């Protein structure tokens, strides 16, 4: 039986590579040939299930393909699976990813069917994304990935997983299947060959989670997180990896913080989003901001996310309050800056006792300060009412949230690095200005705006931890 399994499995793969691939390549192109082979490899998992389930051979089979693909990568043995534009390690990554999940399934039996779901997402979903994207002309998202390929990945993954669900004994609902399929498409955008890992490991973990712990709360949290990814990524407000992190945070705030946690996080985000739209309309001459990056999302939401998870695990209300303060402080600081730039008057630096140019850290405007006060007051009031805090505790939340804006201002003025442009003479926080390297002016050289935001968030979160330690 084992010998027959090897003969059938290897024979099928060699048929794809040496017969089907060259035939398709002759009548179409190399990319179509590559991805048809890629998609056809779904049957390898099916054959492993028939011949090698729960034996070490389920690992040996993909290991063989690691060796063969590595040799092909080095010596260009399989013309039907190597790109015309040069060798890429994607075929090796494919085999390594499948080996990893099959190895995990060998040692932990409950991971067996998640390994199959991962294999189907990688073969059908990733394969369809490339085939459709390569042969259609639609908007590019990132790294050459297109909207049509993205939608094709969702559809192909969903259909293949519905078939998988019907054939194999896996207890996942249709909504759960759709969540895994959409998540696979989101992770496929990683690109550069690394999508072989992201799609495989992501769908592997999600399917294991949903098979064992599916609940309405989990489905709602994951569904909402995916919607937020679409909003922030497709609007260009946050870059790809920042959007992925935002997605994780949204899920954590709902799953561990409940409805209040989710509504609180979403209200802060959409307020900033709305202010950005209004600012663009009222002051179109202002320079367009770049998409927020992963590090900025981590700084603004990392501590808040950590404490909301601790709240969900421990049930201690103080953890939720600290999370609200951590998120609220970063939100109000951003709100103050975004609203403040609408002021026609120059911001005032209270530490240096002089006016500074708009956009330079350390400056405060009346308009921005008023926005910070209003935002902090609303957070304090809503938190006190929703969590049934005392009036004194609500005032402490208000004070801590607003205090972060002041701490950020002081640090921005005192320690954030600033430069002088040799061309126009203006003070800037960028190392280059007017196309020339800027000269160091003041501050600590390695402390930029991200450092200032992180330090102010840590200080306020630590203060909240001390103040509410007995709550």
Enumerate the predicted regions with their spans:
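Viral RNA-dependent RNA polymerase
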Residues: 79-87
């Amino acid at each position: 039986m084992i010998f027959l399994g090897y003969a059938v499995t290897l024979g099928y793969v060699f048929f794809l590579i040496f017969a089907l691939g060259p035939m398709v390549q002759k009548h179409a192109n190399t990319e179509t040939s590559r991805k048809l082979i890629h998609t056809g490899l779904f049957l390898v998992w099916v054959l492993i299930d028939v011949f090698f389930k729960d034996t070490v051979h389920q690992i040996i089979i993909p290991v063989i393909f690691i060796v063969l693909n590595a040799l092909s990568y080095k010596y260009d043995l399989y013309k039907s699976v190597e790109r015309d534009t040069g060798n890429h390690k994607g075929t090796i990554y494919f085999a390594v990813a499948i080996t990893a999940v099959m190895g995990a399934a060998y040692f932990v039996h409950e991971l067996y069917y998640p390994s199959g779901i991962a294999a189907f997402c990688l073969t059908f979903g990733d394969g369809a994304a490339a085939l459709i994207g390569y042969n259609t002309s639609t908007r590019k998202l990132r790294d050459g990935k297109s909207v049509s390929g993205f939608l094709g990945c969702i559809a192909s993954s969903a259909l293949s997983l519905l078939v998988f669900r019907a054939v194999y004994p896996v207890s996942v609902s249709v909504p759960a299947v759709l969540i895994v399929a959409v998540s696979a498409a989101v992770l496929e955008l990683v690109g550069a060959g690394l999508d072989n890992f992201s799609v495989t490991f992501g769908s592997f973990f999600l399917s294991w989670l949903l098979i064992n712990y599916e609940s309405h709360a989990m489905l709602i949290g994951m569904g909402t997180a995916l919607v937020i990814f679409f909003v922030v990524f497709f609007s260009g407000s946050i870059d790809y990896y920042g959007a992925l992190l935002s997605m994780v945070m949204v899920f954590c705030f709902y799953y561990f913080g409940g409805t209040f946690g989710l509504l609180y996080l979403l209200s802060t985000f959409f307020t900033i989003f709305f202010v950005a739209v209004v600012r663009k309309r009222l002051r179109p001459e202002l320079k367009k901001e770049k998409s927020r990056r992963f590090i900025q999302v981590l700084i603004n939401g990392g501590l808040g996310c950590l404490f909301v998870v601790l709240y969900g695990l421990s049930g201690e209300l103080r953890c939720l309050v600290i999370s609200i303060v951590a998120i609220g402080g970063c939100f109000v600081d951003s709100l103050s800056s975004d609203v403040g730039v609408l002021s026609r008057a120059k911001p005032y630096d209270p530490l240096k006792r002089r006016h500074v140019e708009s956009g330079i850290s350390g400056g405060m405007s009346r308009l921005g300060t008023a926005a910070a006060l209003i935002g902090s007051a609303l957070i304090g009031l809503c938190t006190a009412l929703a969590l049934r805090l005392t009036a004194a505790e609500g005032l402490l939340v208000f004070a801590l949230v607003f205090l972060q804006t002041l701490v950020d201002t002081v640090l921005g003025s005192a320690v954030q690095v600033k430069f002088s442009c040799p061309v126009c003479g203006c003070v800037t926080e960028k190392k280059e200005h007017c196309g020339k390297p800027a000269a160091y002016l003041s501050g600590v050289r390695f402390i930029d705006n991200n450092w200032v935001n992180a330090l102010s968030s840590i200080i306020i979160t630590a203060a909240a931890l001390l103040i509410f330690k007995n709550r």
